[in-house]
Amino acid sequence: HETDSDGQVMNSMIEALTELQEMIVNLRYAFLTVHKARSFGSGSERLYVSNKEIKTFEPLKEICEEAGGHIPSPQLENQNKAFANVLERHNKAAYLVVGDSANFTNWAAGQPNEADGTCVKADTHGFWHSASCDEKLLVVCEFYFIL
């Protein structure tokens, strides 16, 4: 665009940029409000969501990644509780991932027991059990936002 002598094109671009900046601020505020409300309700910054499907471990991993999430990996007691609330609501167990250097664990009595399998599942009370990766369990994905 050629600028006229009064700089009207430049002024209109500055106005448009200012409007866009205001929209971004408003969208960020709306997003953070919804995120905080969901976190307040669950007690966790992480969000655990089920699509109600039943899958083995590998398809679950793909489903969660395609949705922009991950297989649940609770790092704190409140995260595990939020995860367990989803399982209790659906009355089903689900897979989770436990890191090698996990600071938080919630193994059930007698667990882990690799004879039961190399994957890990959580029951409706949030206790963790060794499991076969071929077991069909509730699909639950974990989402979290870092801003």
Curated annotation (Swiss-Prot):
It is found in: Secreted. Disulfide bonds join 64-141, 119-133. GO terms for cellular component: extracellular region. Its main location: secreted. Keywords: Calcium, Disulfide bond, Glycoprotein, Lectin, Phospholipase A2 inhibitor, Secreted. The keyword Disulfide bond applies. PLI binds directly phospholipase A2 in the presence or absence of calcium. Inhibitory activity of the PLI-B homotrimer is less specific than that of the PLI-A homotrimer. Belongs to the alpha-type phospholipase A2 inhibitor family. This is Phospholipase A2 inhibitor subunit B.
